[in-house]
Amino acid sequence: VAAAYGAERDQSAVAFTPGAERALSALDGDYRIGMVTNGDPGMQSQKLAGLGVEDYFEVVVHGGVDAPYKPNAEPFHLALDELGVAPERAVHVGNSHEADVVGAHAAGLRSVWLADGREVVDLDPVPHHVVESLHDVAAEPWV
């Protein structure tokens, strides 16, 4: 059922997470931007095209296809290798503590967790930075 729904759903009919468009445009040009996702490649490419942001990303690594799923460190390392960036010089922004923060730490990256109203208690590992909105991603202290 899930596969049939995914195949029929228009993945390009998506909206920006608040602050995402601002963050991408603010970071573009000064930083190399990649994406590490556990999402289906076809769905993810439709979403990026629907938002008109595919050109912001120099590399997109799909966990479960190009490498093991996050939180495994391998998809992060694959993206970094393609970007030519050392882990200690990179930051990963994500909304899943389990996949994004744990994976970023396993790969040696700094982490920014989009809490989006969720409580920040008893998290292991503790994210390097916590933001409530992607509006906060375009500015210091983490860039």
Where are these regions (language model features)?
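A metal-dependent, Asp-based hydrolase signature
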Residues: 1-5
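Charged, low-complexity surface patches
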Residues: 16, 37, 93
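Asp-based, Mg2+/Mn2+-dependent phosphohydrolase catalytic module
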Residues: 25, 32, 40-41, 45-143
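Short, flexible loop segments at the rims of nucleotide/cofactor-binding pockets, characterized by
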Residues: 10-14, 38-39, 68
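Short, acidic loop-to-helix structural element flanking the phosphoryl-transfer center
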Residues: 7-33
